[in-house]
Amino acid sequence: MKNAAILAILITMTFISCCSYAQQGSGRKILIVYLSRTGNTKAIAEIIHRNTGGRLLALELVQPYPDNYQATVQQVVKENETGYLPPLKTKVDSMQQYAIVFVGFPTWGMQLPPPVKSFLTAYDLSGKTVIPFNTNAGYGVGSSFDAVSALCKNSKVLKGFSLQGGVERDGKMLVIKDEQQAAAEVKVKKWLQETGLAANR
C-alpha cells in the first residue's frame, strides 16, 4: 500500500512537471516578420512558419516602392545615402508579447533594406531573441546581418539563414517553388534545429 502511494505521488509529480514544460513551450510566442518583393523571402518565411508556428507578418510601406525595378533601385540608393527610413504601413500591437522575432529580407545593394531598418528602429526588441533570414541574387547577405546585430544591440541575435533566390534584374522572380522549395525546406529545417528552434511536430 505504501509503495503504491509513493508511486502515485511520483506519477502525479511527473505529470505536473510535463504539463508545466508544455505550457512554457506553448507560451513562447514567435513573430515572423518579412519583406519580400519577388516572393522568395516570403517562401522562406512560410517554411519557417510551418515549422515553428507563431505569427506571420509581411512588412508593407505607407508608400510602396515602384513596380519598375530600376526606379526602386535608384530610390533605395538615395534612402541608404540619406539614412531615410520609409514609414511602415504594417503595425505590430503589443510587441512585448513576443519572445522570438524572425526578421526576413532580400539583399538590396549588398545592404539591409530600408524598410527592415524602419522596423528594427521602430520597435524595442531588447531582451528578445532575433533571428535574421535572407534571400539574395547570388551575391550573399552583404552587410545585412551585421546591420541587424547593430540595430539589435540589446537582443540575442542568433545565426542567420541565407539562400539564393531570384534575380529581378534579369526577370527571374519567384524561384523558390516546386523542387527548389522542397530543397529549401530541408535546409531551413536543418538551420532551425541548429538554432534550437525547430518545433517537435
List each language-model region with its residue ranges.
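Charged, often glycine-rich, active-site loop that binds/positions anionic groups
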Residues: 67-81
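FMN-binding flavodoxin-like domain, especially the glycine-rich phosphate-binding loop
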Residues: 11-31, 35-60, 81-105, 109-201
